[in-house]
A protein has these predicted regions:
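Intrinsically disordered, low-complexity regulatory regions enriched in serine/threonine/proline
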Residues: 2-28, 58-252
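Amphipathic alpha-helical segments
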Residues: 28-52
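Proline- and acidic/polar-enriched loop/turn elements at helix boundaries
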Residues: 54-56
Length: 252
């Protein structure tokens, strides 16, 4: 029995036709199931990825050592939007006090990513911008004033509507960043955006590793020396990983 069927039966059993359900909230487990049942098939088909974890979808690595990653970007534990970007086989991530590779489904990390401009450029005092922001959000929390038996269908419809709204932007992003050179240009644009600098402080590190990958080694090392790290040990670990790229080649 699907999530929709289970919740539908619960509502049929607990609410009379004339009862007004004001608030309805899916549990975290139910939300995961709803997304897996109703959004994953669309995401996998439209973006050529597979679900690899709850709220995370990714492709296989391509010949350049890149893989698409789409995931939830949480506002809190009940509201989220989507983020989309790339994971790179040759770029590590910082995990606690260690700099490690992010090459498996379990350790996957989105090195460079974007969100809808309608989401981060919202202005609560501007009605049109607020409406655009609302179109980018999904939630496991729902308010309905009548016809409680249809609440799950309404949540599913709302999720699909948000995904449909964002899909063209996501698809255009991947078309516009399909090479390392195009990704570098995109990183430079994001570095001019205070919002992206705030939510993704690793952009400069990603840029350095891509430069090194493209054989611009002197510039990569020069730019690396300008990056501020939380401590010297982390910097040294990143530098060691950077130099190890001399021996890197995509495993395909």
């Amino acid at each position: 029995m699907s999530l929709l069927q289970k919740c539908w039966q619960f509502l049929v059993n607990h609410f009379e036709d004339n009862h007004s359900l004001i608030h309805f909230e899916l549990t975290a487990t139910q939300w995961k199931a709803l997304v897996r049942e109703h959004l994953t098939p669309i995401i996998e088909k439209e973006l050529q990825v597979k679900q690899i974890a709850d709220f995370v979808w990714a492709s296989e690595y391509n010949s350049l050592g890149m893989r698409k990653v789409i995931s939830f970007f949480y506002l809190n534990n009940a509201y989220a939007t989507f983020k989309w970007g790339w994971n790179f086989e040759f770029i590590p991530k910082c995990s606690g006090s260690k700099v490690v590779w992010a090459r498996t489904d379990k350790s996957i990390y989105t090195h460079v990513y974007e969100l809808s401009k309608d989401f981060y450029n919202s202005d609560g005092t501007n009605r049109k911008k607020r409406e655009a922001y609302d179109r980018t959000i999904v939630s496991r929390y729902f308010v309905i004033e009548k016809n409680a038996k249809n609440v799950i269908k309404k949540i599913v419809k709302d999720h699909k509507k948000t995904l449909k709204y964002l899909l063209p932007t996501i698809q255009e992003y991947y078309r516009s960043t399909e090479t390392m050179e195009l990704i570098l240009r995109r990183i430079d644009l994001n570095l001019e955006n205070p919002y992206y600098c705030f939510i993704n402080p690793g952009l400069l590190i990603s840029k350095v590793f891509i430069l090194y990958y493209l054989k611009s080694k002197e510039k990569a090392i020069s730019d690396f020396e300008k990056i501020s790290f939380q401590c010297e040990d982390i910097k040294n670990q990143y530098y060691k990983k950077l130099l190890s790229m001399e021996e890197y080649s995509p495993k395909r």
